[in-house]
Amino acid sequence: MAAACFCARTCAVLAVALLGSSATVQAEPTNLLAGRQPERAKGVVHPERLTDGLLSNEGDEWLTDVTSRFTSVSSFVEYDLGGDKTLRCLLVQADNNDVYAMSASSDGKSWRSLWRVGAEPSPGMRARTTQLEGSARYLRLAATGGDALYSVAEIAAYSECPRAPWPADLPHAHGIPVSEAAGIKVLIFGLLAGAFVLVHRRQWPALQYILALPVLGAGWMMVAEYVGLYPFFDQEPPLRALAAGLAALVVIKEAFLAKRWAPHRAVSLATLVFCAVTAFGTYYHFGMPQFFDQAKGRRTLVHTWDMRHYYPVAKYFRELRFDGLYLASLAAYIDNTPGFRPADLAHVRLRDLRDAEMRTGTEVAGQLAGIRARFSPARWQEFRRDMKYFSDTMGGQDYLGSMQDHGGNATPVWILPAYLIFKNWPASELSISLAGLIDPVLVLLLFFVIWRTYGMRIMLYVVVIWGATDFYNFGSNLMGSTLRQDWLVALGLGTCAMKRGRHFLGGLLMAYGGLIRAFPAMATFFFLAPIGWYAFDYWHARRRLPSLGQVRQAEGSALRALVGAAVCVVSLVALTSAMFGFSASWLAWKQKIEIHATGPSTNNVGLRNVLAFNPNLSAKALSQRPQSGPWGDWATAQKMTFAARRPLFYGILLLAVALGLLACRGRTLEEVALIGLLLIPFCFYPSNYYCHFVFLLPLAVARPLLDRDRTFAVVLVVLAAMCLGQYFSLAEGWTDLRYTYQSFILLAGFAIILAYLAWESLTLAPWARPLPAAAPAASAAAR
């Protein structure tokens, strides 16, 4: 590949030279910027590429060895043409969704606008040209808008416009994407580091650590590459795969190779620390905000897409309820936008949250007065001001486009604390950014509690899976959102509480996690499994069921957890019903979720997704058919395919539940609860980011002698393999296919874990074990 790229670039350079000579003969117009170096530049990487006469192939990736990167909205480059020159044609080849300003000056101090270089609809690098009548000595190109990921391949200016087929006749080359170069360095470092982890031995002399020098050198080159790329948003996947792979090698070395190749604990610990820090950093993009503030022309910490849904739903739930978000958003946009005409409604598409069907603005226009009437005049003005922040920040097109999502789907229990947080805060970058810090603080608290409960090494493995999985990504992750990881933290803290013997508190916390997002309640339901196994063993031994007192003595921990869960459910349902009304909150939420949970969605994962998949009816395949609307036809095909395979769905579901219940035998209560989470993708149809709970699964098999525990190693290796499999799934650009592949990965991994734990349970608690005659014995789940 390198040789091919070298040949291509050599040919391109020769073409530049040949075209230059032919231009002399034919008196073609001269590019006034050809070969010039910038007079001034700010925040521009490789400015020499801007005037080297070489363009990227149309549609190529935005960041390659042919392009120059503008690192921020304040980046610019200025050129001195050597004197006043007539300007009639300009060319800029840049990333399609970038917006630039070309300015002119006679003295290099006073600038006037010459050309607004707008965005292009087609993806990748795209050339823009314009004809004009002007003159200048100095030219400036500055980034002004777009997604803040700016790159330019070429700038050209002409006193006379070149003849057709310009600019197609200019030299082009396919650049090597920077992500490939970074990925190669990650691969080299990973291979060297992995080899060292496997080969080194604790008993060998210190001289063996000379082998670490190539590892350190490769690591330095990798870090230098990423520092040069910063800020970056699409180069994290290789780092996530690296963290998962190295952590898996550490646990393999300790669990399976310790007798002959006993590792040095300091090396293992240092490797895990590196993996955990890397994985944690990739989730938070190493501190770089994800979204662009169109009003301020820079990046913002606010997750604008997520918070434009959950901020208003929380603050104005009494008015919006679960069906009014998009109608009110549209009405506020109309009121806030001078010149918006009724005819413009025909171009607006939004999801009707009553039935999840898509409709045009014209079709719902008659409902806008009704949604305004839900508000008092003062509250409506407040809502308008808050939504104006989001429409200004997102831009009108993205703001209106976001109304094709599914609204806010959180339960009334989630809405309660979010309402208390936002009710007195006007929507602003400061207020929502501060609220967005709640989640990382909660996550760090969870990691600290896991450290105190299970030890540092377990905590490091948990952090690695937390950051290395791709389940939390759907275009972006939830960095910058508020209370979107609270349910994960509640499940983790509940696990730690039960590990410490605080079963009432553990049950309460796990039930709280279930009340926030519903399907995590599987952990709470599995509190019944130890009681069921105790009753089965008692009946098998004595042919009668145990008394309530005997169950209380044997399974007191499970009963205390159930009481804690019941207290949580009853109190919070009562409180939210008192605040918001039971019918307007819980019944309305139930109706909305019943619609949302069964309708096809491209980023949903699980057994239902796999069984609804037909490669001949994917959106990609349907898009190649004439007269086909791929996404509408795709949804119909999903429903029909799943309906035909529904019996298979129930058969696999019953098998998974049986394995899950069998895996619970002989295990402690917190382990049983986490095993219950393994059934979520079999029973439900969750969005991919809700499967982020996989990072908690190492706690289901955490044992005191971790470095010799093969069960922990098997589970960790399976989870790491899932992370690696997700890395390869990212090559698929069609979202329905990508998340179908990730569904296969998820189900295969969980099936292996369930089968292994079920097989192991037969040794932890032999089938139908006899009970002592004197008194009922506590099962392992109570110990």
PLM regions and their residue ranges:
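Aromatic-enriched
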Residues: V701-A777, R783
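Short, intrinsically disordered terminal tails adjacent to the first/last structured region
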Residues: A2-A12, L18, A27-E28, L207-V215, ...
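Extracellular carbohydrate recognition and processing domains
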Residues: R112-L132
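Disordered, acidic Ser/Thr/Pro-rich linker "stalks" and the adjacent N-terminal cap
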Residues: A27-D84, Q93-D95, R116-S122, E154-E180, ...
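Primarily membrane-embedded glycan-assembly and transfer machineries that use lipid-linked glycans
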Residues: A173-H503, I531-N688, F695, W767-P770
